[in-house]
């Protein structure tokens, strides 16, 4: 089955899918930051959290051991994490869109030309840059009261305190770096250059199709 990608392009499509899935999965999983509170493990992402304290009987704090997202966007602990949520989400969406188009290029002929591949590579660079910006913004929220309670009350911006970064944070950053550096470069060689004969055939086919449709419309 012919497709619109070269051998390098096929590898580019596969790597694009891997990086997009890795970054997007890491974005949704609440394993960016690990700490503890009231003797229970606690983990965060930008907009989700696992295990949180609530007031029990007698107004004592007890830990609810479950994962969930914050009730609203404004409930996210800090402005930096709110910005991180938006920026990283936009980057993941862009990488997923390019990955989907790249995979379709493996199955459809004449979908991705050499120029189109380079444009998609530029989009991947922007997507990776957005995710990288989100990862850079994330430490700015470590001084929020909610995070400080989890990190021994000694955390601050770019200071973890007793907490540690989780694997999802590294996975998101790694996926962004791969998209920016490797996928962007491979995209320059992904699409096939259309052959002149093929271009003429396509033009003639489209012209004949339009002529038939016009003739059909003009008939009484």
UniProtKB/Swiss-Prot annotation:
Which spans of this chain does the record mark as coiled coil? none
Q: Which stretches are transmembrane?
A: 86-106, 122-142, 165-185
Tissue specificity, please? Answer: Widely expressed. Strongly expressed in vagina and ovary. Weakly expressed in spleen, kidney, thymus, testis, brain, lung, intestine and uterus.
Compartment(s) of residence: Membrane
Write the signal peptide boundaries. Answer: 1-20
Its main subcellular localisation, reduced to a broad class, is membrane
Topology in membrane? Multi-pass membrane protein
Q: Which UniProt keywords apply?
A: Glycoprotein, Membrane, Signal, Transmembrane, Transmembrane helix
Q: Which domain of life is it from?
A: Eukaryota
Q: Which residues, renumbered to this chain, are glycosylated?
A: 153
Report the GO terms under cellular component. Answer: membrane
Nucleus among keywords: no
Extract the PANTHER family matched here: LHFPL TETRASPAN SUBFAMILY MEMBER 1 PROTEIN (PTHR12489:SF15), LIPOMA HMGIC FUSION PARTNER-LIKE PROTEIN (PTHR12489)
The family note in this entry says: Belongs to the LHFP family.
Q: Give the protein name, as stated in the record.
A: LHFPL tetraspan subfamily member 1 protein
């Amino acid at each position: 089955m012919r497709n619109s990608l070269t051998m390098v392009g096929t590898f580019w499509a596969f790597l694009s899918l891997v990086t997009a899935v890795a970054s997007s999965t890491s974005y949704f999983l609440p394993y960016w930051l690990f700490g503890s509170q009231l003797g229970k493990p606690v983990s965060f992402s930008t907009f989700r959290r696992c295990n949180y304290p609530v007031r029990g009987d007698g107004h004592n704090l007890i830990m609810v051991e479950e994962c969930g997202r914050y009730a609203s966007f404004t409930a996210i602990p800090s402005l930096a994490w709110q910005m991180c949520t938006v920026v990283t989400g936009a980057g993941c969406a862009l990488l997923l869109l390019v990955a989907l188009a790249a995979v379709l290029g493996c199955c459809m002929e004449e979908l991705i030309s050499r120029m189109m591949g380079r444009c998609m590579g530029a989009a991947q660079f922007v997507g990776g840059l957005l995710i990288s910006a989100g990862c850079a913004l994330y430490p700015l929220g470590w001084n929020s009261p909610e995070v400080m309670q989890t990190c021994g009350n000694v955390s601050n911006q770019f200071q973890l305190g007793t907490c540690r970064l989780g694997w999802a944070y590294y996975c998101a950053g790694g996926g962004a770096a791969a998209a920016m550096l490797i996928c962007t470069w491979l995209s320059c060689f992904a699409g096939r250059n259309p052959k002149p004969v093929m271009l003429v055939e396509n033009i003639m086919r489209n012209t004949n199709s339009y002529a038939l449709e016009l003739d059909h419309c003009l008939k009484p």
